Amino acid sequence: MANWLNQLQSLLGQSSSSTSSSADQGLVKLLVPGALGGLAGLLVANKSARKLLTKYGTNALLVGGGAVAGTVLWNKYKDKIRAAHQDEPQFGAQSTPLDERTARLILALVFAAKSDGHIDAKERAAIDQQLRGAGVEEQGRVLIEQAIEQPLDPQRLATGVRNEEEALEIYFLSCAAIDIDHFMERSYLNALGDALKIPQDVRDGIERDLEQQKRTLAE
């Protein structure tokens, strides 16, 4: 795997030594202690969202299947998403390779960060400077720059999702990175949930749990 991708995985808290078999175990292995806070701190402007992502980065985003929702509820979420994809025979049969999954999570984080329409030239320059300061090589910076330049496209994030764990991680990460205080953010999450076929009760549960976590961190 390219060194620049390893660096981005490090910022996401992913182990560069992860194998396809470990990736099959989902976020428990994909986002390990130290996860997400580094990259989220560079891309997410909202203070409470950044605190939340940093918290789960420090303690592992998901522990045993769901630090926020709890393992039992998290598994119920997955069951409901799997049922929503029952007309897709191959869904759940395999996992996306780790490098593709990394790039997709980065794209999801960038899309969430700009879902209110605000990543201007000054902010982009600041992001690039911080990425350079974090030691991310040119190819990694280009990946993020390209993601920033792309129009918001929830369907693109959903394309290639192979199982319920991958669908859930994208929606969870996006909700964690967004404070829904603008109709554009709500519209984006609605479109993303539709594209990923996340049932409405699962969306509501994730948002409710994350909002409670954000309120707790703000106290």
Swiss-Prot record:
Cytoplasmic side: 75-219
Positions on the Periplasmic side per record topology: 1-51
Bilayer disposition of the protein: Single-pass membrane protein
Cross-referenced Gene3D superfamilies: TerB-like
GO CC terms in record: plasma membrane
Location relative to the cell: Cell inner membrane
CDD domains in the record: terB_like_YebE (cd07178)
The protein's name in its UniProt record: Inner membrane protein YebE
Gene that produces this protein: yebE
Record-linked SUPFAM superfamilies: TerB-like
Keyword Calcium among record annotations: no
Organism phylogeny: Bacteria, Pseudomonadati, Pseudomonadota, Gammaproteobacteria, Enterobacterales
Organism domain of life: Bacteria
Major location category of this protein: membrane
UniProt keyword Cell membrane, yes or no: yes
